[in-house]
Amino acid sequence: MLRKAKTGDVRTIHRMINLSSSEGEILPRSLVDIYNSLRDFYVYIDDGTGEIVGICAMHIFWENLAEIRSLFVDHRYRKRGIGKKLVEACISE
């Protein structure tokens, strides 16, 4: 299930970003930064477990310029199109 991130998701988003950052995949972000940009995030939830397994944020600079930030999908859920769905959700907004 794909949805906009909620305040209760911030710690999980932060944990996922830190995990990915420690593996050299994305840049780290602070809790404050995530709270401040929460409206930019989408999360993907495993319907069976209710666990957040993917995250993505897009920051819009101008009408025709944006940047995908903090794209991460749990290793166990990769190669299923989840990252693509997250990016498409961010772009379609």
List each model region and its residues.
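A generic local structural motif
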Residues: 27-31, 88-89
